[in-house]
Amino acid sequence: QTAIQNAFMLKEDFQYMLVSKDTFFMLLAAGALAPITEYVEGSEYLKDQISEVGWDLVTKDGEIYGVPQRAAKNCAALGLAYRADWLKDYNEANPEDQIDAPSEENGYSMCVSDFRKMLEYFNTRVAKGGHALGIGNGVTCMTEILPAFGVYQKWMETDGTVQFMTEQPGFEEYAEYMTGLYDDGLVYYQATSNDTGVIAAFQSEMAGVVEAAHWEAYTLETVSAPEGEDLSQYTDDNIGYISALVPDDNKGDASAVRVWSGQGYNSICVLPSYNTAEQSAAVVDWMDKKLEPELYRESVIGVEGETYTVENGEYYPILPEFNDRMGYADKLISGNREEDNSKYWLARTRKTAAQDKLFSTINYNVDNTGIKNPVDMMSTNDAYDNYFSKANTDVSDQLVLMLFNSAEAFDLQKVHDIWVADNGDDITNSITEWYNSWGSKDIYNEVKAR
């Protein structure tokens, strides 16, 4: 950030720069950015290809000061990997008390009581010394489990106040559920980075359920692949994925599924205030021309038949050509065809069949189930910037002691007191004030709480 500041202060010879959202607001406050409203309004593609939410982010006093870069896809990155073969064995042995497997019909969900029942059975199947559910180091709030208790994001508006997750209604019930699992010996918690990781625990049958990111699927699924198998196309039918848990009252109801998703604007193209009008006009025109549909597609994913194929309207990479020629292409764009990019980017999640399996499962119907964190769209905020990191760390450390340590019972009041002592009320009030003045608050999350 200091280097960027210096580049602007010294009026170095550049016409535009890609900066982080936080740096954008710092430069905007310093008066270092050129307004580009008239050029955006006169563009052929640019204005219409970026959402109202995006333009709102970079607008101040009616002037546009940057071209926002949205994350390619509204999606969840994490899901629960589970031993599908063990669940099948349980159901065959218990025809009168079966557990519904995650499927398209139920939105790849499972209700909380069935999940616990599955863990109880898995505890009889793990290797000696293992536990049914493996939870990674530092993880206290499992985003696949929290929605079952009404906690849909790290920050959510409730009755006019934007609340941190531990302050939201439902968190106490979540914590009691998790402590119950731990106290009954169903959970392995990776206490330090030197302890066995949960992916390794799953691979060695020391755990039957773990949280996994979609980029970890290849490691999970290919460990038992037959010799000579094409690993890029291999998936293991013994492994399945859960997108989220639902309340028992919503068992089997795909419309009740809610997942933590994300799609913020993490970077912004900006122009220095010392640009001439001709320079600014030329830069925006250049960005606009790159959004011509055919040129944009070729810039992002290459040429059909050479770097990608299209199957049923979906884009799939041709390897290794896609990696060799287009590996970093999505990092070099300035301005997006947002809707098109959300389809093209999926080719990057399909580099292996295993990754495609995990990603597509946990993001099944995500446009109707995913809830995003509004704070991802917030401008600079003194209370949040100054206090939140410490408050978040202190609360998380306390949750580790309470959730994964039988010696200390969960105490919501104690968690709340830590939050307050770390200026949590100031953070909450400041975020709420911003949120209530945010022009896009009513359209940012199209999916609502259950």
Residue ranges and their predicted role:
Residues 37-43, 59-140, 156-208, 270-282, ...:
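Helix-loop-helix "hinge/cap" segment bordering the ligand-binding cleft or interdomain interface
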Residues 22-79, 140-179, 227-262:
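Hinge/lid segment of periplasmic solute-binding proteins
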Residues 13, 25-29, 35, 123-132, ...:
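Secretory-pathway/luminal and periplasmic proteins that interact with or process carbohydrate-rich
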Residues 140-157, 179-336:
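Extracytoplasmic/periplasmic substrate-binding proteins
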Residues 398-450:
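Histidine-centered catalytic/metal-binding microenvironments
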Residues 96-108, 161-165, 378-385, 399-404, ...:
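Second-shell loop/turn segments in exported
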Residues 1-53, 59, 89-97, 155, ...:
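Extracytoplasmic "Venus flytrap"/periplasmic binding protein-like
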Residues 285-406:
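Conserved small-residue motifs centered on glycine
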